Amino acid sequence: MIKHYLKVAFRNLIKYKTQSLVSIIGLAVGFTCFALSVLWIRYEMTYDNFYEGADRIYLAGSSFRLYGDGFTYNSSSFLADYLAKNCPEIEKVCRIFYDWNEKKIKNEDVEFVVRRIEVDSNFISMFNIKVLDGDNHLQLKKDEIAITENTAKRIFGKESPIGKHLILEESNEEKIIVAVVKSWEGHSLFSFDILLPFHDTNPNWGNQRCQTLFRIYPNCDIEALKQRLSEYEVQQDGHKYPNSTLIAPLSTLRSSHPREDVNVKLNHIRLFACISGLVIICGICNYLTMLITRIRMRKRELALRKVNGSSNGGLLTLLLTELVLLLILSSGIGLVLIELILPTFKRLSQINEGVSFFYIEVFVYILSLIAVTVGFASLLIRYISKRTLLSNINKKSNLHLSGWFYKSSILFQLFIGIAFVFCTLVMMKQLNFLLNTKELGIERHNVGAVVYCSENVPFKEILEQMPDVTKYLSGFQTPIPKMYFSTFRIKEWEGKATDSEQYIDLEDETINQEYADFFGVEVLEGSMLDEKDGKNMVVINEAAVKAFGWTQPVGKKIDKLGRHYIVKGVIKNISYNAPIHPVAPAMFFLPDNTGRGGIIFKVKEGTWNVVSEKIKAEVNKVNPNAELMLSNMEEVYDTYMKSERTLCQLLSIVSFICIAIAVFGIFSLVTLSCQQRRKEIAIRKVNGANIGIILNLFFREYLLLLVFSSFFAFPLGYVMMKHWLENYIKQTPIEWWLYAVIFIGMGFVIFLSIIWRVWKAAQQNPAEVLKGE
């Protein structure tokens, strides 16, 4: 019997091959996107959750408004001792220095790339590092290291690494291996291959180069600890300084405070998972609409099967077999798609796991989706078949596809499709606006910088000899990426209420006319600083004017540590950070001519690669092992929008699939409708209706559905996008033409999808049609 059901199901899929193909492709893409995105979400949410007491482990960071969301992972090496002495809630605290970049090591002239972490003795006990071989106490000295068992196998094979030497290529230091330790049991922000002893060459509260981790006692009030660490005093060199420490749970650190190397933020992954789920729903609705329509077309056949002894369960199994077969085919194609895109997905998601890890989870998710789909479809098909099976068994169906399920399905698919297209276009418009706007305060196109070089290289002379370099600027830190941070607190300024305890934190920046001309900095009020002004004249940005509450800022006085400064001008806000973060108030001074900072230069269009290679070649002439950090400001700024750009690309693909499902669904349903309404069309032609009237009859029905779906999709899309745009400082307007273009475009696509089928039906000879009926 099952074999018979499969034959019938397969023949129906072949008979309606266009509709079946659209459903299979749509569901395959939906299954793939949904399964991978759910896997991705689960992976992101399980970072650093495998330690003992993982829910009680926190990272103590610092606040930098020019860095990401203002939370940095770094802190002073003094902080660990302060926490241990002054915070009774803390059970254990440790210091580490994590090298976020992979480094090279040598073993007998063979190079290996590894991840390194410097740790103190508390780290070993706090994270229960297990020693598999060697020194069980693991008190690392200056020239000693420990490696993981995986690294030991990679470098030494089956030989024991204890007592062997490795050379750190960066510093050319030789280290002796004293222990082999167990790797992390799960994925971590601080994954490592080598453990080195922690050492801070310049410990002070202002030097924030390490990461401080601590574990609190169970049932402690973490909010009270956060409040206490938000503002406290520290002492150094006989002086007291205000300090502030931010803390965040280690298990959610990657999602709550993502670093710049995270490709896609967790909230964007969740959004994509929801959208993928909607694509699956669209595909299933599209197929179920056609399946239920065909059930009602086959009601005489089903009634005859019932009369001849078929049970209700047997009929339900017959009808569900086609759906299950379609879902299995979709799943198979989905698995093929996963195999094709897996390398790209692994790179994008930064999931460094074996192939089996992906397929096991994906298979579970797909089976779950199939089970839920079949369960829902069983209830729906049983309900529809009960209403149609025994009613009017001897009458031929005059179904005109005007049932509630049909209209609801088309409305839902059009609603989702229009909303997808609208949201995707707004996102792409916003992304294009942010990447090309002049509202960021500085010109970054074709601007490069030598951020750091370990050797004394005459870059000025080198750049002057390059015809592709149009101009250069020295003595300033590169604004993007921001490599130099300095802030100070202002407690007194002109216009402040005498009884107020308000203060304002300002960024300490430098500027002059040369800098303003180079970057195109716009002066809004007053004038730019001049060398003749002296050291008491400053300019401030728009954010500082707002913070001080001034309406006429030029000429106002600011007191900094007992010294008075006069505001000479106001410049446009300069965005050093991602556009989702507000610009901090800043005060700009003349440069002190100490020669600090790198060198910034402009290149001709399309010559960045040539210029950068020439600079690297010149540095290699001085020292082949020299460290050089070159920066292209436009490329760096584009990385700030990496997550949004990736989301837009994913949404574009999903939106296309969703629209294709809706359009081909309409095409398929029109095909079935024309087949059902052949007699009606023939009678209308006999009564004088031309092809235009018949075409208008169909198009008007779908146009009304388009109007209704647009009526709900556009307002919802506007509310969602308005809320999303509020995350950005600079926002693109949502203009009226977006609505018009989407509505007209969808109407045109619907018209094209129905015209051919209706035209073909209208061209048939009425006499032949009526004879066949």
Task: Name the predicted role of every residue range.
Residues 3-6, 11, 15, 19, ...:
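Membrane-helix entry/capping segments
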Residues 6-14, 18, 22, 26, ...:
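Intracellular coupling helices
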Residues 13, 23, 44, 60, ...:
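Generic structural signal for small/hydrophobic residues in well-ordered secondary structure
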Residues 15-42, 265-300, 327-328, 332, ...:
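Hydrophobic alpha-helical transmembrane segments of multi-pass inner-membrane transport and secretion
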Residues 32, 36, 246, 323-389, ...:
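Small-residue-rich transmembrane alpha-helices
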Residues 37-102, 203, 207-215, 224-228, ...:
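Membrane-proximal extracellular/periplasmic loop immediately following the first transmembrane helix
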Residues 120-133, 145-264, 461-639:
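Mid-to-C-terminal secondary-structure elements
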Residues 625-706, 710, 721:
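C-terminal transmembrane helical bundles of large multi-pass transporters
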